[in-house]
Amino acid sequence: MAFISSGYNPAKPMENRITDIGPRKFTEFFPPVIAKNAGNWDYHEILEPGILVHVAKNGDKVFTVRCGAARLMSTSHIREACEIAKKFCNGHLRFTTRNNIEFMVDNEETLKALVADLKTRKFAAGSFKFPIGGTGASISNIVHTQGWVYCHTPATDASGPVKAVMDELFEEFTSMRLPAIVRVSLACCINMCGAVHCSDIGLVGIHRKPPMIDHENLANLCEIPLAVAACPTAAVKPITAEVNGQKVKSVAINNDRCMYCG
């Protein structure tokens, strides 16, 4: 009855059926100039570091401003990016696979105003909120794995080391004086979900010692059977440990079998 009341007709089961319940089709989010010229672009050029122009066969142009951004952003920072997009780009923006934000406009006057606005937006310490660069023969934005904020296997955090590295390499992000584009990535452990092995320079955090066991709290922090099953070398086994005169369920590590995966 619930299905019938919602409009479902048993006699015509395919009528008004929704067959795609995933994300909306990506073409719905194109800026008008890109939607108009999809598949009909003639060429593109890098006008200066971080600024590109794509020219369609009919002469239409779209100017793209690429800004470096963090992988993990605050809601206030995202809202500010949306505010910029609403002010200059009719509400359109896009994120690249290397955590850049791209703002797209269709005329040079708006482009100049957008760039001038981005250069005035700084954090309290003076660093740019939306640094322009990452195109051509430069260092692209660093991609990294999840880090301590969520993942339970990292040997190091991600955001701190990435910030420190990019502080040193910032000039190469905003210029194009290298022989070719250079990609730098960081993985917090050897699982390398950030695909650092596909980058020119990979920073990998590794565990050097077997894990220490907190027998008192282990059973309250994880499911012991899953912890045992997760070990790829069978180095973890369940035991009954004694803590403050009480027996508790815990695990023991076979150090000779441990591969330090985290």
Curated annotation (Swiss-Prot):
It is an enzyme of class 1 (oxidoreductase). It catalyses: [DsrC protein]-trisulfide + NAD(+) + 3 H2O = [DsrC protein]-dithiol + sulfite + NADH + 3 H(+). One of its GO terms (molecular function) is metal ion binding. Its cofactor is [4Fe-4S] cluster; siroheme. Keywords: 4Fe-4S, Iron, Iron-sulfur, Metal-binding, Oxidoreductase. [4Fe-4S] cluster 2 binds at residues 231, 258, 261. The keyword Lipid metabolism does not apply. SUPFAM superfamilies: 4Fe-4S ferredoxins (SSF54862), Nitrite/Sulfite reductase N-terminal domain-like (SSF55124). Pfam families: NIR_SIR, NIR_SIR_ferr. [4Fe-4S] cluster 1 binds at residues 151, 188-189, 193. Its EC number is 1.8.1.22. Binds 2 [4Fe-4S] clusters per subunit. Siroheme binds at residue 193. Heterohexamer of two alpha, two beta and two gamma subunits. Catalyzes the reduction of sulfite to sulfide. This is the terminal oxidation reaction in sulfate respiration, a process catalyzed by the sulfate-reducing bacteria. This is Sulfite reductase, dissimilatory-type subunit beta. It comes from Megalodesulfovibrio gigas (strain ATCC 19364 / DSM 1382 / NCIMB 9332 / VKM B-1759). The lineage of its organism: Bacteria, Pseudomonadati, Thermodesulfobacteriota, Desulfovibrionia, Desulfovibrionales.
